[in-house]
């Protein structure tokens, strides 16, 4: 099938909201340093706009935005803000370091939200949109306005809101399917009619932001493009609130593979898709399912004999894109004690990590120390080192002792808390892991309900390390964590702390972040 497009192919803008909407997915919070690591990868991936966070919600988000602004000079950096003067002022200040700043302001427009959430009339909504978009435009030249719950808004009112936002200075109009309610035919028509009828529509970019509650986020985003949208808001691996968002890897590869049909492309550097996906999985502890399109472990696997026979004859029989087009590799580079710093840095770059000079130095020292304990260092080992290097906040394991007490196990753990103080606790359990988790719960004050726990090896042969993976619940919300060590009990402790620290960071951010709109 011909997938080529002409040299004059129009380009879609990719607005990545992994660090804002994606991070609102339960259990997916990141430290400012982790956000910076992810933002570097998104920059290398070629996204046009990176939504960095919601500065009014926490100091952590403000710090992350400032860090990204000082370092990333190519992409547009956007921050989310409610239609509140204080929010907009805080967001504008957070963007002071950015080379290409964008203020993204939003307000609900649907009758359901107007009546029950905002308690505002149509006229009050229009006045608020005009006042706050005007205020935002006074700080930056690039202002995006989102009509939250647009797909459940009366179309005549949505047109009026859009007209007012454009007149007030908005440069991008986002029409979110906030609860994943619409269908491709409906959203295509909505975009087409509004772009054709609203005064000033030809002077702005229209954007789609689709949620996946009915599994239609990518299909709806493609339909919005057919209707005239020229920006798509998406996340790596489709993470996000509830069932998630439009997946960046799926929408961009759909446009690339079906280029002759859509006649529109993106600037995404597709061979970096898999490494970026895997980087996010490690940072937030949320693996993708094996049959996930594009980035899942089975995306290019063929077990059927008929399929294998066809692939041997011609790979195009059962593959519509090449694994290497999205960054899958057929071989793994193995590093060891004779490997130099340049080789380690190159491999980390291939895995999606872009590091400063001091960060490379620190990780290389850890790499050399690891080489003293084992012959070879694999990709999984490097990813584990990076996970340790980027998690700078929260409790750290200082020491632990496991012993038998009759038929039960006793665990003594000593942790270093976020302020550098030491805290020690003991607990008994039916086995070493049960006792360990009890002691960790006492030391941190975090109670987790264990759903599943497994340990497997990473690395090669006798040098392999144990990776513990666990799934837990806290207040009814599921979290996943991973930890890696030569000692599987220590790996289990690190996996437990991975979840606990993420949960504690969410608590510190407070309830404001939870109220940020689903705006998206």
From Swiss-Prot:
Family membership: Belongs to the alpha-IPM synthase/homocitrate synthase family. LeuA type 1 subfamily.
UniProt subunit comment: Homodimer.
Cofactor requirement: Mn(2+)
Name of this chain's protein: 2-isopropylmalate synthase
Subcellular location: Cytoplasm
CDD domains referenced in this protein's UniProt entry, alphabetically: DRE_TIM_IPMS (cd07940)
Keyword Amino-acid biosynthesis: yes
InterPro entries the UniProt entry points to: 2-IPM_HCS-like (IPR050073), 2-isopropylmalate_synth_dimer (IPR013709), AIPM/Hcit_synth_CS (IPR002034), Aldolase_TIM (IPR013785), LeuA/HCS_post-cat (IPR054691), LeuA_allosteric_dom_sf (IPR036230), LeuA_bact_synth (IPR005671), PYR_CT (IPR000891)
Known function: Catalyzes the condensation of the acetyl group of acetyl-CoA with 3-methyl-2-oxobutanoate (2-ketoisovalerate) to form 3-carboxy-3-hydroxy-4-methylpentanoate (2-isopropylmalate).
Domain Pyruvate carboxyltransferase stretches: 12-274
Record keywords, A-Z: Amino-acid biosynthesis, Branched-chain amino acid biosynthesis, Cytoplasm, Leucine biosynthesis, Manganese, Metal-binding, Transferase
Keyword Oxidoreductase: no
Cellular component, GO, one term: cytosol
Record EC number: 2.3.3.13
A Pfam family hit: HMGL-like
GO biological process, one term: L-leucine biosynthetic process
Enzymatic class: transferase
Matching Gene3D superfamilies: 1.10.238.260, 3.30.160.270, Aldolase class I
Gene Ontology MF terms in the entry: 2-isopropylmalate synthase activity; acetyl-CoA C-acetyltransferase activity; manganese ion binding
PROSITE patterns on file: AIPM_HOMOCIT_SYNTH_1 (PS00815), AIPM_HOMOCIT_SYNTH_2 (PS00816), PYR_CT (PS50991)
Binding site for Mn(2+): 21, 209, 211, 245
Start and end residues of each stretch annotated as Regulatory domain: 396-520
Major site of localization recorded for this protein: cytoplasm
Catalytic reaction list: 3-methyl-2-oxobutanoate + acetyl-CoA + H2O = (2S)-2-isopropylmalate + CoA + H(+)
Pathway stated in the Swiss-Prot or TrEMBL entry: Amino-acid biosynthesis; L-leucine biosynthesis; L-leucine from 3-methyl-2-oxobutanoate: step 1/4
């Amino acid at each position: 099938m011909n997938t080529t497009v002409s040299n004059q192919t129009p380009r879609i803008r990719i607005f990545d909201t992994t660090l804002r909407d994606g991070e609102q997915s339960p259990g997916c919070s990141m430290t400012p340093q982790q956000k910076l690591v992810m933002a570097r990868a998104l920059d290398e991936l070629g996204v046009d706009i990176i939504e960095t966070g919601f500065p009014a919600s926490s100091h952590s988000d403000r710090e992350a935005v400032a860090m990204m602004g000082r370092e990333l000079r190519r992409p547009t950096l956007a921050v989310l803000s409610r239609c509140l003067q204080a929010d907009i002022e805080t967001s504008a200040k957070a963007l002071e370091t950015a080379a290409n700043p964008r203020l993204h302001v939003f307000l609900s427009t649907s009758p359901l939200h107007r009546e029950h959430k905002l308690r505002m009339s149509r006229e009050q909504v229009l006045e608020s949109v005009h006042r706050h978009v005007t205020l935002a435009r006074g700080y930056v030249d690039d202002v995006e306005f989102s009509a939250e719950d647009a797909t459940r808004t009366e179309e005549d009112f949505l047109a009026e809101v859009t007209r007012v936002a454009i007149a007030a200075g908005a440069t991008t109009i986002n029409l979110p399917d906030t609860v994943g309610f619409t269908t491709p035919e409906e959203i295509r028509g909505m975009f087409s009619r509004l772009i054709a009828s609203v005064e000033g529509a030809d002077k702005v970019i229209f954007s789609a932001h689709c949620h996946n509650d009915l599994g239609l986020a990518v299909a709806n985003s493609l339909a919005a493009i057919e209707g005239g949208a020229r920006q798509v808001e998406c996340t790596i691996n489709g993470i996000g609130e509830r069932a998630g968002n439009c997946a960046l890897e799926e929408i961009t590869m759909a446009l690339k593979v079906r280029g002759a049909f859509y006649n529109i492309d993106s600037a995404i550097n597709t061979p970096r898709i898999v490494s970026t996906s895997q980087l996010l999985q490690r940072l937030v502890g949320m693996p993708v399912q094996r049959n996930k399109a594009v980035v899942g472990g089975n995306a290019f696997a063929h077990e059927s004999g008929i399929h294998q026979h066809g692939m041997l004859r011609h790979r195009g029989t059962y593959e519509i894109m090449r694994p290497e087009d999205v960054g899958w590799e057929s071989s793994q580079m193995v590093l060891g004690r004779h490997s130099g710093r340049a080789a380690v840095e190159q491999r980390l770059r291939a895995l999606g990590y872009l590091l400063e000079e001091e960060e490379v130095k620190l990780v290389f020292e850890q790499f050399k120390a690891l080489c003293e304990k084992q012959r070879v260092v694999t990709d999984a080992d490097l990813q584990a080192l990076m996970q340790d290097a980027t998690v700078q906040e929260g409790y750290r394991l200082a020491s632990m002792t496991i012993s038998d007490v009759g038929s039960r196990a006793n665990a003594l753990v000593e942790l270093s808390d976020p302020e550098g103080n030491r805290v020690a606790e003991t607990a008994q359990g039916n086995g070493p892991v049960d006792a360990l988790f009890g002691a960790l719960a006492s030391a941190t004050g975090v109670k987790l309900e264990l759903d599943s726990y497994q340990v497997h090896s990473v690395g090669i042969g006798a040098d392999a390390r144990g990776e513990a993976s666990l799934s837990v619940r806290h207040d009814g919300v599921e979290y996943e964590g991973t930890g890696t060590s030569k000692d599987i009990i220590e790996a289990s402790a690190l996996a437990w702390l991975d979840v606990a620290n993420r949960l504690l960071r969410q608590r510190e951010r407070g309830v404001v972040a939870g109220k940020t709109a689903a705006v998206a």
